[in-house]
């Protein structure tokens, strides 16, 4: 009898959905699964695989989940039913609570028996080193993540857990008052394409699979780091965590059919060189994961890249904003006001995690919470001035009490000039004496921006 590594003591099962439990036994073995007052029996198929679907559980517990055959069995203790979220992406999602600017104040208070953490950490970080033969062999067998187990939230466990995921989960706990389980499998430096399933890329983006270590669709830094890590390999098919599909195969497929409520995602730094390719990849990513969980409406809330002195980032952030209108059941947390001009890893993570939680509370849980700051809806021109309207624009103001800044306007020639911007009711009026016939407006269009509209 063999179960997914997600099945451990202290696990959280998704409430209010049919509860699929599956595993592997000897062909023909009778398998019994029971939890609370529910029990189901089935027989393992010729390939040993078996699956049962139990009626939904309400939030609560603790329960004991029992899975047995005639010869052997497992008992998982202290199991809760609640809300399960996957927290994924690259290093800013991986960034630990103990590294955050709020660590000293918040770690001692991180005590919650009903917040459970499943922390999938990499066995080998993708640092600037050449990996040895045993590492390279393990990678070829998709053995990239350390074995782990569900743990109660304590100062010790929260300290090494994702800061953004922790603050997201804490806000859900405080608002919903039900158990919350967080699964984190983020990998520093990982590009979007590593998280997409192979069939999707083969059919819809085959060019990115071709000779990936020399492929211009893939960021030069990503290719360079991978080439260094696998330098000692003589295997022309040597695998690496940054390879297209690799993290899907090693970090997402093992979670298949473990019911979750939704996903939070912070990634893009390793794709910011090519926003057009990323737009295509991001849509494939969302669809890939929705297929994996057989849920076309799986909520997917993501972080817009922060502020940093890299020229391509305004284009990338704008592309991420457009995705809000092109994919269903998603939301975007802005982070540019908490950036660091010189560090790709800003330490202020609490507001970002809580902004993701606001999207979940509003859209997934139908709570009366404003999910976002102002989001551009439309514009009209009157008398040489542009009037911008916004979703979530009630009570707009500047974040620092100073005049609005970082607005620019241009005529048809596309030459932008700094503009004056003022809140007028539920609109923002933008104008410049240098631009009598404005055609375009942009806002926060600096790699590191001090834009201040909230």
Predicted regions and their residues:
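Cell-envelope and extracellular/periplasmic
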Residues: 1-454
